[in-house]
Amino acid sequence: MHKRPLSILLRPLGLLYGLIAEIRNTLFETALLTPWRPPCPVVSIGNITAGGTGKTPMVDWTTKYFLSLGCRVAIISRGYGRLTKGVQMVSDGRHLLLSAREAGDETAMLAANNPEAIVVAAEKRKEGARFIQKTFENFPPDVIILDDAFQHRQMARDLDIVIVSASEPFFKARMLPEGRLREPLRNLARADIILLGKITDPDEADAIEHALTATGRPVLRTRVHTLGLEPVTDCSEESANTGVQLQALAFAGIAAPEEFLASLRRTGTDVRAHRFFRDHQPYTTETVRSLIREAKEKGLSLVTTEKDWFRLLGDPQLKELMEHAGCSYLKIETRLPEGEEKLRMALRDLVGR
């Protein structure tokens, strides 16, 4: 009853948002605005909606593949939720230089999981790329990966990958702020490859894939593969890997927490209680103590996402509290059940490997 009047109020803002997006895109398409091109190939991984579609795991997959080819890789991410501003070096490809508080949880996680990659946080991806070009002038990267950059057209890219979630009816979605669309759906035709992820209903996924083929772009399906629970300390390993069904209090501050719970249950974890927070929301000592107290009272083990664990790692006190509590986090990765070789070939062609 309350949602419809609010939707009506927000609709004019959505129309204005869409108009501004279209004007901006037209300026680039008519060459009135020219994107800056760095000296190395660029891959952009983004989406057309606000919220989680699985961009970060896909950036991780792409980075690992380029590294396996022997490439020197640089990642540029906005660094959502960080306390710093401007261009920040998160990793120089040898050392992790910033915590999640300074770099953003996703950016810090990408850097820690890919220690050989250069990782930079920058709201303006072009400024981040110029910083990399200047800093690593004598040993430049072979390829730059832009995280969440489909709408960041100031920087040219050689391969535009867009991820679409099959778990939300985005074809019926409206523009921000009424809905979750960042720009009109017809702009998916600007992508080079469309990845369809978060598939729960195969029939619905077939219908979405059929609709996406109208863009004339290849559509490949992805899935989240659950690797299992990782204890945050060696002393919590026994509780996480005894083979006995884990009874858990799950907590997360991500865009799609229900999918986290579903992935947890696929590991055999018995989720008895859960607590959700806003995406990228900083944890406080009070919140963490409350979670630990509730888990202890109910006789449950604390389980969270890897992204949330990196956010907690950024604060030494919160890290210590969770280590003593025997917390574990869920480790996941992106896989492409079909079409993986097609994507690999596109990436290899880009770097001439």
Curated annotation (Swiss-Prot):
Disulfide bonds: none annotated. GO terms for molecular function: ATP binding; tetraacyldisaccharide 4'-kinase activity. Keywords: ATP-binding, Kinase, Lipid A biosynthesis, Lipid biosynthesis, Lipid metabolism, Nucleotide-binding, Transferase. HAMAP family: LpxK. Belongs to the LpxK family. One of its GO terms (cellular component) is plasma membrane. PANTHER family: TETRAACYLDISACCHARIDE 4'-KINASE, TETRAACYLDISACCHARIDE 4'-KINASE, MITOCHONDRIAL-RELATED. The lineage of its organism: Bacteria, Pseudomonadati, Chlorobiota, Chlorobiia, Chlorobiales. ATP binds at residues 49-56. It comes from the Bacteria. The keyword Nucleotide-binding applies. Pathway: Glycolipid biosynthesis; lipid IV(A) biosynthesis; lipid IV(A) from (3R)-3-hydroxytetradecanoyl-[acyl-carrier-protein] and UDP-N-acetyl-alpha-D-glucosamine: step 6/6. It is an enzyme of class 2 (transferase). This is Tetraacyldisaccharide 4'-kinase. It catalyses: a lipid A disaccharide + ATP = a lipid IVA + ADP + H(+). Its EC number is 2.7.1.130. Transfers the gamma-phosphate of ATP to the 4'-position of a tetraacyldisaccharide 1-phosphate intermediate (termed DS-1-P) to form tetraacyldisaccharide 1,4'-bis-phosphate (lipid IVA). One of its GO terms (biological process) is lipopolysaccharide core region biosynthetic process.
